């Protein structure tokens, strides 16, 4: 089963930036009920989509205070556990981050290691810009798209 997930958050001054499981010092953070980690959130959505388990909002809704301020890594770890509990194994997740900053390439391998450990399966990350187009191009926020491959095992 293949699932696709997306997430988008605007920048919010006064918050730390968490992206792809990493904290990015000296960067403006993203708004959100949790830590705003668009890469981790898109990966969660992709997992839930692949296994027909709803989406990030239905699994970790803003009405549930347990998830307020939660890290994207914690959400992704929990998402992977729920997918396995539903009878699926995770093959891999691929994440594409869309935004002008931070410069992702220098920390890509570090992010992949953290996210792979959270999922218990390979996670690859890439980043791109929109060449000045749209809200990410204007530097107003960051978006991410993820694809997950899951296999029913029971």
Swiss-Prot record:
Q: What is this protein called?
A: 2-C-methyl-D-erythritol 2,4-cyclodiphosphate synthase
Q: Which Pfam families match?
A: YgbB
Q: Which residues does the annotation say bind a divalent metal cation? A: 7, 9, 41
Q: In which pathway does it act?
A: Isoprenoid biosynthesis; isopentenyl diphosphate biosynthesis via DXP pathway; isopentenyl diphosphate from 1-deoxy-D-xylulose 5-phosphate: step 4/6
What catalytic activity does the UniProt entry give for this protein? 4-CDP-2-C-methyl-D-erythritol 2-phosphate = 2-C-methyl-D-erythritol 2,4-cyclic diphosphate + CMP
UniProt keywords (A-Z) are: Isoprene biosynthesis, Lyase, Metal-binding
Indicate whether Ligase appears among the record's keywords.
Answer: no
InterPro entries recorded: MECDP_synthase, MECDP_synthase_CS, MECDP_synthase_sf
PROSITE patterns reported for this sequence: ISPF (PS01350)
| Gene (UniProt) | ispF
| Subunit structure, interactors included | Homotrimer.
Q: Does the keyword Lyase apply?
A: yes
Cofactor binding, per record = Binds 1 divalent metal cation per subunit.
Task: Point out the annotated site residues (description: Transition state stabilizer).
Answer: 33, 129
GO BP term, example: terpenoid biosynthetic process
GO MF entry, a single one: metal ion binding
* Residues that bind 4-CDP-2-C-methyl-D-erythritol 2-phosphate: 7-9, 33-34, 55-57, 128-131, 135, 138
Q: Which cofactor does it need?
A: a divalent metal cation
For this protein, what is the EC number? 4.6.1.12
Could you say which protein family the record assigns here?
A: Belongs to the IspF family.
